[in-house]
Structure formats: structure tokens, C-alpha cells
Amino acid sequence: MRLFHLTFVLCGTVALAWSPHSGAQAADSSLQAVFKRMDEASPKFKGLKADVKKLAHVDVINDDTVDIGTIVVRVPKPHDLQMLFDFKQPDQKTVQIEGAKVQIYYPKTNTVQDYDLGKNHKAQVEQFLKLGFGSNSRDLQDSFAVTLGGPETIGGESATRIELIPKSKDLLATFPKFELWISDKTGISVQQKMYQPGKDYSLATYTNMQILPNIPESAVKLNLPKNVNREHPLK
């Protein structure tokens, strides 16, 4: 299940003096505003480039593992998400994600690992794709119970945090909650957090984001040496 971190990356307060009824109305109004921004951005979104920081927290030993690099996202058609992560620190690796297929290239050992998650985890993969860049509010609400978190600033950019609880029992058992920070300016997620049972979580933050309409397919493809060593860990 660790591989699902790659596809995911791999996402204010209501005044206590208000009555519960008016507070619910205000929260709903703010959530609808987030949905509106997402729905306006979704049909126009074709791709982006950004710097990425991915943090994986293991609570039992209070340990954080941080990967730093860049990401390129390409969406040639709805629900067709292609991504390339190029991590430079602390260990160099490049991750290509296309649908349910994942490739991880380790240049130090000249090894690429191939994973096909579609056969055994098709439903989970489809859920994760709905968390991807350029999703609309209907995609999210079909698969998640969505509530308002509140306004926050991520990398100097104003955003609104929303919380998502999976409707699928299988996904809920593995990842009980997700959080997305949706840019108030672009309607695109600038931070994503994925919780696991207990207090472990994975957090991906995107900065220096450029929304681009014409990402070439070559920009989301691994450029592998001819003599690369190929492994299939799931076989």
C-alpha cells in the first residue's frame, strides 16, 4: 500500500457565538465557494510544473522522511492523469505515474521498478485519481464526504483546506482521512495530506507552481538508459 503515497503525491474557524444553524450555513457557503473555484478550474486544467516537498511521518518513532524535487503534471483528457516526480534530495529517484502504472527509476543503481496497480487495486486507484490535480467537486463528492477546514496560507499563497472522508469501506480502513488545500486564486490543490490508521501521515506541498496549457508528453516520461536494469517487485 506504500505505493499509493506516490499517486497522491505520491494532497478558519467558525465563531463560537454563532448559532449551530447559521454556522452550518456559513460553512456550507464557504465550501460551495471552494467547489465553484475547483469547477471553474477543472475543464481548463491541462497541466502544471512545480517544486514539491513530500514528508512522510511515522508516529511510533516520531520520524519524518522528506523528499524534495519537482513535479510535472499532464492531463490530456479528463481522468487521464500523467505525472513525473524528479526527486533530488536526499536520494535521487524519478517516479512516473500514468493511470494505475508506476515506474520508479534509481539512477545510482541504474534500476527501474515497474508496478501495475490496476489488476488488484483498481477501485483504490480510481479513488486516488479523483484526488488528483484538476478534479471537480462532483468527482470528490462521489467518493468522499467533504467538509470545510478553513483558510490557511501555504507557501505564501492563500488557500482553503477541505477534509475528505472516503465513502469506500476498503479505502477508509487504509486511509481514514485526506486533506486538500485548494488555492483561492487558481482552484488547484497546493497541498495534500493523507492519513493512515494511527498517527502516520504523508504530506505533499507544491510551490512555485506554473499552470501550463501545453505540457508535451515527453515531459512526463522517464528517459531511461538502454542498459537499464528492470525489476517487477509485484510479480
What name fits each language-model region?
Residues 52-56, 77, 87-91, 99-101, ...:
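A mature extracytoplasmic/lumenal domain signature
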Residues 18-26:
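Sec/Tat signal peptide C-region and signal peptidase I cleavage site
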Residues 107-139:
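Glycine-rich, pocket-lining loop/helix-strand segments that form or immediately flank
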Residues 29-104:
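N-terminal mature ectodomain segment of secretory-pathway/periplasmic proteins
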Residues 7-17:
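Bacterial N-terminal signal peptides
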Residues 28, 33, 103, 113-115, ...:
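Gly/Pro-enriched, hydrophobic low-complexity segments
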Residues 1-5:
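Positively charged n-region of N-terminal signal peptides that target proteins for export
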Residues 63-68, 92-94, 110-112, 175-177, ...:
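Short, mixed charged/polar active-site loops
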